[in-house]
């Protein structure tokens, strides 16, 4: 998580040097190198691989929403939904397959190899798309030439100016708080279920259900926000849905399935909502890049504290009540940030 936050701030400089798609290609290469390094039976290589892996993911998290906004401005809702849905799906597949692959192969090389192959495939597909673009794709899908009306201000200068915009910090709260929720849930819900007598494999299944449920929800988030009377109403509904899911998790038994679906749908929609709010409150690609960098850089750094605070509360109180009260408070704070972001103002 620390790598996510710190490396996010490198995105504007990388984009200024390599261009938007070149920067995304470099991030994918880092992702592939990081996954490959984990095969080396050496602690330093493993740690370096994990850092490069986090750096690649962080850069892609910042850059891909900008690619969507600048290259497919008429399809932002659908493509942002698909993008965030795939993020959730990949996490769900990882949670579901890690233990079986390890048990089947008897080594961490099997799950590591699975994701190395995935990173290689992603890089190959991306490079193929870039090659198709150079061979005459439509102007809407092009990824190199800047638009005439694009911001003239340098990315780093715009980022510094964005730091002074109150709305940018509100959007950072929207991104950071939803990140806090998913990291905390993924880190501690399996431990809670294990304390209730659930097997390790079964906890993986429920985490998969939780993350997979976010896929259809994230795709439908743009339409959901349109049918709601206001963004603040949509934020309140998603917050309530997450709280109900959390209550079902704690109840256990027959409530686990509907609770996992409800919490997962809310979580997936929250991430999609964060990107949609960024897009709607920025005018150009450079403004989107600055807000995406700030919200994800600071947001991820703050989100890393979520699992730590949850664990400290568990240790200090000896029970699960205080940690889950903290979790509920984070949900409510997310809804408050969406309410504050319900404005016609833009950051840039």
Mark where each language-model region is.
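A late C-terminal transmembrane helix in Major Facilitator Superfamily
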Residues: 285-319, 327
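Helix-loop-helix hairpin linking two adjacent transmembrane segments in secondary transporters
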Residues: 74-75, 82-134
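C-terminal transmembrane helical hairpin of 12-TM major facilitator-type secondary transporters
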Residues: 229-277
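Cytoplasmic helix-loop-helix junction between adjacent transmembrane helices
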Residues: 51-85
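Conserved MFS/SLC helix-loop-helix module at the cytosolic interface between two early adjacent transmembrane helices
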Residues: 6-43
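Residue-level signature of mid-helix packing/kink "hotspots" within the transmembrane helices
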Residues: 1-9, 91-92, 211-219, 303-304
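Extracytoplasmic gate region of multi-pass secondary transporters
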Residues: 166-208, 214-217
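Helix-to-loop junctions at the C-terminal end of transmembrane segments
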Residues: 7-19, 217-230
């Amino acid at each position: 998580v620390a790598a996510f936050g710190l490396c996010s701030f490198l995105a504007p400089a990388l984009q200024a040097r390599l261009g938007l798609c070149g920067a995304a290609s470099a991030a994918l290469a880092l992702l592939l190198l990081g996954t490959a390094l984990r095969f080396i039976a050496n602690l330093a290589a493993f740690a370096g691989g994990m850092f490069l892996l986090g750096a690649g993911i962080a850069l892609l998290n910042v850059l891909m929403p900008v690619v969507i906004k600048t290259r497919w401005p008429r399809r932002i809702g659908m493509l942002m939904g698909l993008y965030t849905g795939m993020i959730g799906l990949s996490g769900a597949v990882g949670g579901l397959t890690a233990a079986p692959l390890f048990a089947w192969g008897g080594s961490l090389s099997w799950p590591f190899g699975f994701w190395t192959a995935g990173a290689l495939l992603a890089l190959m597909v991306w490079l193929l798309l870039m090659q198709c673009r150079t061979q005459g794709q439509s102007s809407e899908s092009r990824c190199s030439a800047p638009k005439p009306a694009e911001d003239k201000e340098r990315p780093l200068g715009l980022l510094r100016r964005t730091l002074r915009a109150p709305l940018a910090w509100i959007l950072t709260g929207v991104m950071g708080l939803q990140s806090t929720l998913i990291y905390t849930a993924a880190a501690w819900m399996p431990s809670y279920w294990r304390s209730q007598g659930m097997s390790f494999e079964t906890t993986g299944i429920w985490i998969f259900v939780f993350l997979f449920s976010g896929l259809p929800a994230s795709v439908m988030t743009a339409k959901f926000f349109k049918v709601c009377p206001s963004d603040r109403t949509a934020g309140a509904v998603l917050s309530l849905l997450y709280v109900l899911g959390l209550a079902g998790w704690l109840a256990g038994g027959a409530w686990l399935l509907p609770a996992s679906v409800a919490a997962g749908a809310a979580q997936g929609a929250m991430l999609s909502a964060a990107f949609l709010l960024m897009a709607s409150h920025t005018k150009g690609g450079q403004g989107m890049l600055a807000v995406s960098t700030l919200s994800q850089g600071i947001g991820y750094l703050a989100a890393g504290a979520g699992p730590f605070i949850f664990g400290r509360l568990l240790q200090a109180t000896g029970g699960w009540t205080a940690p889950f009260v903290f979790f509920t408070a984070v949900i409510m704070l997310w809804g408050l940030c969406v309410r504050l972001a319900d404005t016609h103002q833009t950051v840039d």
